[in-house]
Amino acid sequence: MASTGRIPLWIIATFGGIAALTVVGLFIYGSYSGIGSAL
């Protein structure tokens, strides 16, 4: 968090949002393909 002043907040928010959507998408895809049941 020391370099927060050098990194724009919207970049962090965008990256966090994409990462969250990717994780949710993987869980949904895993549940449909049967991999999510093993987690």
UniProtKB/Swiss-Prot annotation:
Lineage top rank: taxon: Eukaryota
Annotated Gene3D superfamilies: 6.10.250.2070
Gene Ontology BP annotations: photosynthesis
Keyword Ribonucleoprotein tagged: no
UniProt KW Glycoprotein keyword: no
Keyword annotations of the record: Chloroplast, Membrane, Photosynthesis, Photosystem II, Plastid, Reaction center, Thylakoid, Transmembrane, Transmembrane helix
Localization: Plastid, Chloroplast thylakoid membrane
Xref: InterPro entries: PSII_PsbJ (IPR002682), PSII_PsbJ_sf (IPR037267)
Pfam annotation, one family: PsbJ
Membrane topology listed for this record: Single-pass membrane protein
Segments passing through the bilayer: 9-29
GO cellular component terms, A-Z: chloroplast thylakoid membrane; photosystem II reaction center
Quaternary assembly: PSII is composed of 1 copy each of membrane proteins PsbA, PsbB, PsbC, PsbD, PsbE, PsbF, PsbH, PsbI, PsbJ, PsbK, PsbL, PsbM, PsbT, PsbX, PsbY, PsbZ, Psb30/Ycf12, at least 3 peripheral proteins of the oxygen-evolving complex and a large number of cofactors. It forms dimeric complexes.
Function statement: One of the components of the core complex of photosystem II (PSII). PSII is a light-driven water:plastoquinone oxidoreductase that uses light energy to abstract electrons from H(2)O, generating O(2) and a proton gradient subsequently used for ATP formation. It consists of a core antenna complex that captures photons, and an electron transfer chain that converts photonic excitation into a charge separation.
NCBIfam families: PRK02565.1
Recorded family membership: Belongs to the PsbJ family.
Record protein name field: Photosystem II reaction center protein J
Organism the protein comes from: Guillardia theta
